[in-house]
Amino acid sequence: MASRRRKLLKIIILGDSGVGKTSLMNQFVNKKFSNQYKATIGADFLTKELQFEDRLFTLQIWDTAGQERFQSLGVAFYRGADCCVLTYDVNVMKSFESLNRWREEFLIQASPADPDNFPFVLLGNKIDVDGGSGRVVSEKKAKAWCMSKGNIPYFETSAKDGTNVEEAFQCIAKNAIQNEPEEETYLPDTIDMAGSTRPQSSSACEC
């Protein structure tokens, strides 16, 4: 079992298939990017340790397929999350329009104790594509959406060149830490359950 000084934080990344969820994870955790696209099957996760003030935290970052047939991963996947990261592609309007559906999906499945104040963070990814000339979702539009959802944090990112990825995940971690209950729990059951039930996955995604 983990030391009492170490806390597990479960982060869920949601968004349509192809928006770059896996690549954002890999850029943050491994500082790597692959141009080869392989869709995530089911769900997968990466971990990274962070220090905040005098405490150590392990971020367990979960990535989903983003496809309709995998949206039934269910309660075991969503429950126990400390922060939810909603992700879209700034060059694909449909991925932005899906954000409300993903947010509702999370709130229904995770059933947080205080849904009105549960921490979400929004990432607008792939700002590097074609030098930004192909984007169809403006920063203003994205920020207006965030404002309508309680002024949640927003970052424009590139998993390919790393723009704002570190900053975004530092914010995600901070929000997750602030959301943790006063009594520290290490969610050992969550780790075991995820490890024994999650589907096999293939994860190497374009940004």
From Swiss-Prot:
InterPro entries: P-loop_NTPase, Small_GTP-bd, Small_GTPase
GO cellular component term, pick one: plasma membrane
Residues reported to bind GTP: 15-22, 63-67, 125-128
Membrane topology: Lipid-anchor
UniProt-listed Gene3D superfamilies: P-loop containing nucleotide triphosphate hydrolases
UniProt record, GO biological process: protein transport
Annotated S-S bridges: none
Function: Protein transport. Probably involved in vesicular traffic.
NCBIfam families for the chain: small_GTP
Family, similarity comment: Belongs to the small GTPase superfamily. Rab family.
Protein name: Ras-related protein Rab7A
Organism: Mesembryanthemum crystallinum
